[in-house]
C-alpha cells in the first residue's frame, strides 16, 4: 500500500474545511450525493458519445447504506468510477475537481446536456466533518483494475489495488462517536429530500417496514407481527420545474408548493418560466394565499431555493430576489451559476444578477397580467402583499414605473381602489399632475382632511395614501411617465389679480389674531399664517420643507430611524372665511383665544393622524369653551 501526502497545504485546508467551511454538517451527504450524480452524468455522456464506452452498461443508481453496528455510512454509485490517476488528481489534491476538468473538455451541446455539479474540488472532504476515517473503493468504466483509497483526514492518504465487480464508486465513512444521527434512516431520508430530492437519478436506501400480525376469522393470531427491511427509493429523481408546464397539472403544482413552502394552504398563483439563450435557467415562483408570519421582520426567512442542476444549494440567500418580493416561494435552477468554494454563499457575479433582473421583470409582468385577467385574485394579492410591493418604489428605481402600475389606490372620488392607469384618465392633460395626500390615520379621517378641501371644491381627484409606508416612500416618487406626482401641500393653484388683492387684505386684517395664536401656542408651532386653501375647516397644518429640521427628519425616516428624531414644529394655517376664526378675531377674551388656539391645533393634529400628547388638557379646554358657549 503506497502512502501519499495531500497537495496544496492539505493539513491547513482540511482543518479549515472541517471546522469552518460549512455551517451545518448534514450537507456532507449533499456533497457526496452530488459527486455520485456527477459520476453518473459523466458516464451517461461518454456512453452516448465515446466509442470506448459504447459497450459499458449504464444502469444509474445511488445507494445509501447505514450500518449502526459498524458505525459506518456508505454512499455507492454506478457511475464512471476512477482509476489510480483520477484518485491522485481528484482525491489527492484539494480544490481541484475532476468534474471541472471534465467540463473544460466539453463543448457545444455536450456542455449544455452535462448536468455537472461539482465545480470545486472540496465537497468530498466534507466527509471528514463527521468521520475519522474514509475508504473509497472505485473502478473506472471500461477498465479492469479497481482501487482502494484510505485517509484519516490527517494530511496523508493511501492507495492500493483491490477488486470490484462493476464500475462505480463506494465511499465508506467510519463515523465519529457523536455523529450517530447520520445512521438513522429517517434522518438520512430527510436530508436527501431537503437537498437532493430533484437530482436526476434515483437514490435507494434500506428502511424498516412493519408487517402487522395476521389473524384468522376468529381473531386468533396465526402469524406474529414483524419488521422487514425494504429497499426503497427516497428521492423523486424528477425536478418538477424541468418538466414542460403544459405537462404539469394544477394538482401537481399545488403538491409541489406544499412540499417547498411547508404549507397546507393552496397557493394564490404560480409562475413557471424557462429561459434559454446566453444564460439558461428555470424559475418556478409561487405567491402564497396568506402573507408569511415573518414578512415584516428583519430576519425573515426567504422562500426561494437555489438549485444548480437540480441539486439544492441554499434557501437562506436573501439576494436571490429583491426584498420587496420576499413573499415569493419557489426555486431558481441554472447550469450557469458559479458558486464559491463552499457552495453556501453565492458569489457576486454577472450571471446571478442577470437571472435576478430577468426574474423580477417576469414576476412584475405576470402580476400585471393577473390584475387585468382576474381582478378578484389580484385584489386578494394586493391585500396581502401590497405594502411590501411598495418598498420597491424606493429600492428598485429601474422597475419603479412597473411597480407603480401594480399598486391600487384609494381616492377622494371613489370608495373602490383603482390602478394608476385608471386614475390618470381623468387627470388634466394640460398640467399632467397627479396629486396625493399621505397620513398615518384612518382612511375616512384622511379623506376628510382639510388639505383636500380646495381639491374637492374644484372637482380634482386625489390619491389618498393612509399607510405608514406611504409617508416614507411617496415623497421620493416624483413622476410616473410624463406625469408629476405632487403632495397636496405643495400644490399652488393659479389666482387672478382680484383674488390676490383680496387675500392680501384678509392677511392684514388677521395679523393680530395670528400673533395672539402664536403667543398662546409658543414653540408648539413654527408660525401661524392665513391660508385661502380651506373651505369648510377652520385650520390645517403645513410642514415647512425649507426647515433644516424637517429635512433631517425626512432623511432619518428614509433610514428607518424616524423615532429617534423629534418632528419639527408645523405651521398652523387659519381660514379667514370660517365663522369660528372670524369670531376669534373679534374676541377680546384672552382666555378663550388661548383655549381655542390649543383646541384648533389639536384638531389639526388629529386630522393628520398625530396622537395628542395632552389628552387631559384637550378635554379641559373643550369643556371650558363649551361652558362659555352655552
Curated annotation (Swiss-Prot):
It comes from Sulfurimonas denitrificans (strain ATCC 33889 / DSM 1251). It is found in: Cytoplasm. Keywords: ATP-binding, Chaperone, Cytoplasm, Nucleotide-binding, Stress response. Its main location: cytoplasm. This is Chaperone protein HtpG. Gene3D superfamilies: 3.30.230.80, 3.40.50.11260, Heat shock protein 90, C-terminal domain, Histidine kinase-like ATPase, C-terminal domain. GO terms for cellular component: cytoplasm. GO terms for molecular function: ATP binding; ATP hydrolysis activity; ATP-dependent protein folding chaperone; unfolded protein binding. The keyword Transferase does not apply. NCBIfam families: PRK05218.1. Homodimer. Disulfide bonds: none annotated. Residues 1-343 are annotated as: A. HAMAP family: HSP90. The keyword Chaperone applies. InterPro entries: HATPase_C_sf, HSP90_C, Hsp90_fam, Hsp90_N, Ribosomal_Su5_D2-typ_SF. Residues 344-554 are annotated as: B.
